[in-house]
Amino acid sequence: LEVVEFILYMLWDMGLKVGHATRDVDDCISQAKADMTIRTAMLEARFLTGDEELFTKFRKKFAGKILSGSARNFVKAKLDERDLRHKRSGESRYLVEPNVKEGKGGLRDLNTLFWIAKYCYAVDTLDELVSCGFLSREELNLFKRCDNFLWAVRCHLHFLTGRAEERLGFDNQSAMAEAMGFKSTSGLNKVERFMRQYFLIAKDVGDLTRIFCARLEAEQTKPGRMARLPALFQRQKQVHGFTISGQRLTMVRSDVFRRNPVNLIRMFKIANDYKLLIDPNTLREVTRSRHLIDKDLRENPEANKLFLEILTSRNHPERILRRMNEAGVLGKLLPDFGRIVAMMQFNMYHHYTADEHLLRAIGILSELERGELEDDHPLAHRLMSQNINRKVIYLAVLLHDIAKGRPEDHSLAGARIARRLGPRLGLTKNETELVAWLVEFHLVMSDTAQRRDLTDPQTIEDFVSNVQTLERLRHLLVLTVVDIRAVGPGVWNGWKGQLLRELYFEAEALLVGSASHANRPLRVANAQKEFLDVLQMNMPDWSEAKCNKYIARHHDAYWLSYDIDTKIKHAALLSSVEDSGFQIEVTEDKKQDVLELNFTCPDHPGLFSRLSGACAVAGLTIVDAKLAITKDGMALDVLRLQEPERENFPDKARVKRLIATIQSVLHGEILPPDRLADVPFSRRVNAFKLVNNVMIDNDVSSHSTVVEVSGLDRPGLLYALAKTLFNLNVTIVSARAVTFGERAVDVFYVQDLTGEKITRKSKLTAIMDGLQMVLANQSKPRRVEQSKQAKSSKSAKQAKQGIKAA
């Protein structure tokens, strides 16, 4: 015991985590019976030194009292433990920040395989697994290759971080790729090549665990001999060289695939049609027979017909496509799909590898069609059930990102693949062209909805000139919804859904001819009438004269830019602003996952930059801003806000702090640069290097110059950009803010001080240079210097006096 104590203290002093216990043999047996974790640890007991006779006694007693007759329970417990572990660490083995130890396809999955084999077959080494028939020689080599790679990754990760870090996060992936010798190539950088190798290994681990755990589960959970008697009288159905027995599909002959390679596709079709599991030995034969999928089979009409039926199945096509992918069949049948298997994109926006994203998108499309997502997507569900070509939409979803990782634009390359693949799968020329168009322009609806002012007629006209037909519009809406939802948890929200629906209905109206400049006065008049009808119900004390006077305060564009509820809020705010100088109202919209902030006060330069600074100080992100000014100079700003991580909805205390912060910023009591200097940067964001970009366009809006800025996100970025525009005497008419992981895209609709587009070249150059300087400054916002603080306080005092004067 003294020796053990000395060794333990030495190991602890070295900072190592060491589990320990002192027990006699009977204690060991008692503990192993009661606790599966302790049982597993004792399963791997090895003799180091000391009384070997005592160790032999323990091994014999452990085998007789613990191992004997309990294999079925152990297998079930380990498989249940595996499933729970996967649920905790992420259900997919293709998460772009995987857990090397506990994640799906990680080291613990290999441990589980060995523990089960050791328990059931009494082996001590990996090589013994071949002699006992648990592994083939090829599978043993694969096991060792996976084990060596994952241990190398884990050791490098621990050395790099200086701690027992198991998650392979973005902030470590670049250094890991460098340490393990990966180099960049055209289309893929070194990080993406390293992570692709990781995911291919994780896929191999998945192949091993799926086949062998299924085999063991089948063996160890077999009922007793008498219980099996009724099964002898069950009829086994044979279909195209396969046997359906119970819930399993099994090949009748081992040469079923060599005799007819089309059976490699047909087998998955049968499994999907009858909702069957595939026998592990049959799956093993599939893996061995993948080389039979050659050019002739890919051009085979029957094979392509079977695949299209699988893809468009109403019976959960994602499940069977996932099995085809895991077996390596999907990538062989569609070589372009094979190129993106296990491919990640080194960014924080995409949560999964490219192939996993496409398979999840197919699953979401199927759920949408079955009505399981109708509450979240009523429009997309209606279109899917009434107006959509199923072959077109399912193929477009499968192909929309199939050309990722190439030097060229993946949308253009994907469209070429679609034009080549459509006829092969039996689509008509028109269907193929529609699929190709959807793949080429699959981002246009999302980009327009999230980055453009949808109340600007020019935005809708430009979008419609691209879409051209209702058929394209309907299919594009469904594809866009599915694509965004499949990116990962928390990416979709109700606000994005509202924007997409708004764009769809505006475009639909223009396509069918019910919206045009000619009937704009009529639309304004109808909107004003609707407002008066609702206003009289909400504010019956308003006289007719007061109503007419209020309507006259607004420009025509106002009546077409806001929904009726917002207009009523504005009426209440403007009627009470005279008493307090300014009014703020914050309402929750949990369906759209946003806080809506309505604010009014006398307009003055820099108002939006102050509001955006206050929101940043309060820890909230502006995702949309509509800024209006009445004819008599009152600002009406509508901001939609979200939590940066989108995991929690802001509580009432947070809302109160937001309002108090806005008041303090407007009164000059809080200076945003001071507060934002203390906001910590995310280490994960700092792992990325982005090319900053400022785009200025005078053609995409009918009334404003559009400035689009993209770069690495950081706290207070929108405030810094808005502040720069204010300093350049630029008026912000409206703004959009979108975040794609680490990349922020902020869009401003701006005018000069006379309310016109900015066309002077020197001014445009100054805007470009000023915004580029903001993007280039990746440091935290600096605290305001004494002289500047005095100047800012003076400006805030003038603004405060303006508010009081109102």
Regions found by a protein language model. Give the residues of each.
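Divalent metal-dependent catalytic cores for phosphoryl transfer on phosphate-bearing substrates
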Residues: 1-3, 8-13, 131, 143-152, ...
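Conserved catalytic alpha/beta cores of large enzymes that bind or transform nucleotide phosphates
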Residues: 12-20, 29-32, 291-311, 366, ...
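Active-site-adjacent "gating/activation" loops or surface patches in catalytic cores
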Residues: 230-250, 326-346, 352-397, 402, ...
